Amino acid sequence: MEKKFLKVGKSISFKFNTDGLECNLTPGMVYNIKVDRFTENISLEESGSLSLPSKVYCTARDERFINKVINSYNLSENGFTGVMLAGLKGSGKTVMAKCIANKSGLPIVNVDKNIRPYILKCLVEKLGDTSVCFLFDELDKLLEDYDDSVLLQVLDGSDTKGKHMILFTCNNTDDISEYLIDRCSRIRYWREFEEMSPSLIMEVLNDKLNDKKEVKSLTDFIKDNFEVCSFDNIASFVKEANDYPTTTFEELFEDMNLSSKGTIKPHSRSCKNSGIKSKKKDVSCDCCWDCCCAG
């Protein structure tokens, strides 16, 4: 295969001049798209590898889904294998997208909201038969001021000579173009993310909670009280429980950026029964100044 790129340091340019060394894109390497604001020339910049937690919590169903996506891409002959991971914030969509991207064995091109649709279209044309995995995190936010008609053209494959994987994550599907929904030729796989199952919650607590005697009690507390049982919220709460081992679950909960199902139900570690927490936090003199949960 003819090499289409030139490398100078970490900067990867398309071969429109003779400066630099000829190269191919590296499997598993993340590339950010760079656009010269004067000439609009497109280049790719190496950005290392995707960061993942030391342990990824994955169900057997998750594993089957990931393997199916990879297998379908490998069986495809051209165009895009599209995947949408949608649903609850902090539920592991981005982690799964990264796992799929890594397992694909492809160079990974990160697409952020600063990359205009026509730039993406031009990039696909320049890539030719070089296969990559495109990663769009939080597509719903990106589409707020995005011409999605060009994205639809890209997914239709009219400018695609090779084959690519394209991974999307999305929190709010209401913001997604109706022309992406129920269109398997554009997005073949659509996975909805919901709350963590009790068995998965217990697995996380067994791994992360210092006081193993409290695993069952904290699992019950989470199931009974957390309005949103996402990995993000649960991992943050476990860290609080480890950092403040003498504080009741209720007090930890009251101080965090969490909403309850209603009246807080106490469990083993608890030593008080008072307090009702509404779904929306009330403004008081004890305001939470910083959000301790990512995303």
Describe each model-derived feature in a short phrase.
Residues 115-116, 140-141, 171-176, 195-201:
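Conserved nucleotide-binding/hydrolysis micro-motifs of P-loop NTPases
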Residues 64, 101-130, 145-149:
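Short glycine-rich substrate-engagement loop in P-loop NTPases that contacts/grips substrate
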Residues 1-30, 183, 190-295:
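C-terminal alpha-helical "lid" subdomain
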Residues 45-82:
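Pre-Walker A (pre-P-loop) alpha-helix and adjacent loop at the N terminus of AAA/AAA+ ATPase modules
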Residues 76-97:
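Walker A/P-loop nucleotide-binding motif
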Residues 22-55:
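Conserved ASCE P-loop NTPase core motifs with emphasis on AAA+ ATPases
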Residues 140-184:
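Conserved catalytic/switch belt of AAA+ P-loop NTPases
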Residues 134-137:
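Hydrophobic positions in the central parallel beta-sheet of the AAA+
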